[in-house]
Amino acid sequence: MKQGINGFARRGRL
């Protein structure tokens, strides 16, 4: 996971 919580929560995909 390079995006982290910010990128993950924004896209909504694991």
Curated annotation (Swiss-Prot):
GO biological process terms held by the UniProt record: glycolytic process
Positions contributing to NAD(+) binding: 10-11
GO MF entry, a single one: glyceraldehyde-3-phosphate dehydrogenase (NAD+) (phosphorylating) activity
Enzyme class: oxidoreductase
Additional free-text comment from the UniProt record: Under acid-stress, this protein is expressed at a higher level in wild-type B.cereus than in the acid-sensitive mutant strain NB1.
Family: Belongs to the glyceraldehyde-3-phosphate dehydrogenase family.
Subunit structure comment from the entry: Homotetramer.
Protein name (database record): Glyceraldehyde-3-phosphate dehydrogenase 2
Gene giving rise to this polypeptide: gap2
